[in-house]
Amino acid sequence: MNSLQNHLLIAMPSLQDTFFERSVIYLCEHDEKGAMGLMINRPIGIDVNELLKQMELDEEPDPITSLGSAVLIGGPVNQERGFVLHTPQTNWNNSQSLTDEIMLTTSRDVLTSLGTDAAPENFIVTLGYAGWSKDQLEQELAENTWLSIPATKELLFDIGFNDRWQQATESLGFDIWQLSNQSGHA
């Protein structure tokens, strides 16, 4: 099995009228047991400032610091749980280094650092995650539900969330609308 950890899943155009329509998912984990990822292009409708207030973590907001970044829906599973995908920064209770350029933290202390000098340079805050059981993702890939590309720091952090699906599809080097959603064997 080839792991797709640190890859982006790009929803095929045929995946319409579903939760994952035009979604881009960063795969944090992918092994023989299944896969776990975070959708990186679907805003929930609140920004990080509002989330911190709701969690009562924002006691004295810094008016100079803009935490207007949108909180994103990470996926349909466990939507009350937060995940912060970010550039390397240590000293938090529950962080996992995914690559040399990307970490995942699930502890509240990373949220309290946002807007301070201790915050990571780049971050994405999501609620919930997308999960696949053993062989489920492989089946969906075989059914042409998803395409995958290696993740880049630029696609994760530099491209606006509304443009990530389009930018990811353009990075494929061909017109995704020309692909068939039918799978088959020759």
UniProtKB/Swiss-Prot annotation:
Segments traversing the membrane: none
SUPFAM superfamilies assigned: VC0467-like
Native source organism of the sequence: Shewanella woodyi (strain ATCC 51908 / MS32)
GO cellular component term, pick one: cytosol
InterPro entries in the record: AlgH-like (IPR003774)
Xref: HAMAP family: UPF0301 (MF_00758)
Protein name: UPF0301 protein Swoo_1337
Family assignment from sequence similarity: Belongs to the UPF0301 (AlgH) family.
Gene3D superfamilies: VC0467-like
